[in-house]
Amino acid sequence: MASIPNLNFAKWSQGTENEKAEFVKELGAAYTDIGFITIRNHGFGEDVQDELYHKASEFFGLEKSIKAAYEIDGLAGQRGYTSFGKEHAKGNEAADLKEFWQVGQPNPAYEGPEYHNNVSVGELPEFALSFKLAYQQLEGIGRELLKAIAVYLELDINYFESWVQGGNSILRAIHYPPITIDPGNSVRAGQHEDINLITLLMGASAEGLQVLNKNNEWIGITAIPGSLVVNVGDMLQRLTNGVMKSTTHRVVNPPRETWGTSRYSIPFFLHPVGKMPLNALSNCISNDRPKAFEDITAGNYLEQRLIEIGLKK
């Protein structure tokens, strides 16, 4: 178990002013240090999580030919199915040992090229509804966390609201299949940083997630039962000029004796609308911390990163 702070989300969502201030302080300390926290008492339904994992395992258990029918050209994996070995970490040509399914915003802020229709699975009638319900719950928790982040950054509490309402967030169900041959240099997910503002991860089905701490040591992360793992992504790191850390992480292969087991993971990547500028906040720039990143919009940054990880040509 890694020493990732476990925060009581109820302090923020239901607490007194003092408790809210305590939560903001704890959140800020963690995000400016290692960029990861776990939260408890968050309100995400355990029944919703269990149903989601059940539906995901049902889908990935379908025949390859059936799954392939839901892999849609031209969407860069942003909706529907992406087959095994298509994605790789930035700067690493070895393919990740995974397949995945992505669901996007059911209520887009506007009509734009980044928004695509979600895909239904004919063989699993309740599949889309399960994902929509989880998406909406996780989006709500994420938006509340962004309010706490805004307070820590001395911004208006609703600073992020207009940018994330109807934003381009993604719920991704990932299946890491059993390893049947020597994987060589490939791992289940190569070391990387997330693209988005923050990521919310419900309990994965097996060990394997590791985070690179500031001492350059890999530490294993296991979600405490009933908690969500929430980490900073590159967009928030850029916006805060590196004040908040988008930490490198990976999913390593299991010990050889457990190669025959699958691993499932379902992260929610909270994205803003594509129009949001990721220009560094003025109060995060100083003589000691000069501006570190070029100005770019969230949409253009996403496009750039999708190319780097092999999902877009």
Can you describe what each PLM-predicted range is?
Residues 1-313:
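Peripheral, non-catalytic segments flanking oxidoreductase cores
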